[in-house]
Amino acid sequence: MKKLYFLFILYIHTFFLASCGSDSNEEPTIPEPEKPSYITGINAIVAPTGTFAKDDASSTLDGSSAKNVARLLEKAGPDIIKGMGNINITEAQYKEIKTFTDKLVEGKDTEMNVYREIFKWITTNINYASGYVDNDPYPVFQTKQAICQGYANLLTVMLHSQSIPSMVANGMLVNVGGHAWNYVWLDEWYVSDPTNNGHSRMADFESNKHLDPMSLDAVLFEDEHFVFNFYERHLNLRQVKQSGKQLTVPFSTNGFKVTSFNPDTDLPSEVEEIYIGKNIDTLGESIIGLNQHAPSVKYAYVDKENKKMESYGQVVYRNEIPYYVPASAKTIQFKNIATFGKNFLVDHQHVQTVVIQPGTKTLEAYAFENCPNLQKAYIPEETKVDGNAFYKVHSSFKITRGIVKD
């Protein structure tokens, strides 16, 4: 346990008295303000020792989302579809749908004709629901009621039963709202929208301009270390299969720049440090996977050339707000930020000590919430701490006023 040393610099105040005697009207000089207390030995800032991925001049996906998806799928090919993605269906349910589909397409001699028969049956028999319905494929098959997600799920299952590759896409129906549709392989990629009875070649961007894909329910690329998908309009590092203590996020895969690191499975337990290169634009928007899937990480560092985010200490910031705080960090020294608003740091289970920088004016109520192991906060004397700024922290929590010297 490192000792804390408090260095108090005291001033000797000398009072000058007039030489002409006790009847002088001169007042003693006003002492200078006390200089701040300094705290040493915290060791909150740990310099990175690993490396960032180097720019390899890979291709940037800088077109429309639909064109970016087309480039990725053309590169990946149909073999990426090895199953039905995240569709929820039991073996018995799948068998029943397959038996029905086998009879439906009996006599159809080409994959295109099989597809057309299945597509026709869905668009003719499934009705768009006005209220809540279960959009898993089997309930849709049984009730003949669905919204767009149910249409797309059932189409994928029925095509899969006939060995035709299909994946579900989620995104936006332009000027309408959220939508789901399919990408289907029939000697080339097709866009299939059973909800709206739409079907066209993927390369026909004019016919598909009303569809704006955000995510695909399929793995695009995979190697011995990493798995990649298309998520939130980015080529995303979805899974890290193996790594040492220091994880360098790759710059590219299969000739395309990787711009997102948002895993949906746990990182290897060995990973304690993450090195995020200048290529990464996002760690997630609606869901930040590192918050849930990086339990052993203590430090995250961002390349200084990254224009979307930065790191200070072990914390990643975006727009002056903590974007990612490693789950296993125990001592955290934050950037100089004027105001720590509500939920500045919330639900962190391992942090024990936080250090606030000079220049921070206010810690608002509930700035730190539900951090059960947080026991110490080092805060400059001039920083205002609102009531309940530290809420649901350790029972022995204590604030020490002073400035931590690196």
Name what the model sees in each region.
Residues 7-16:
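Bacterial N-terminal signal peptides
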Residues 225, 230, 242-259, 268-282, ...:
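Structural signature of tandem-repeat unit edges
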Residues 15-42:
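Bacterial Sec-dependent N-terminal signal peptides
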Residues 77-143:
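Secondary-structure boundary elements
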Residues 1-4:
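Positively charged n-region of N-terminal signal peptides that target proteins for export
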Residues 32-98:
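N-terminal module-boundary/linker segments of secreted carbohydrate-active enzymes
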Residues 151-215:
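Hydrophobic/aromatic-rich core segments of domains that either
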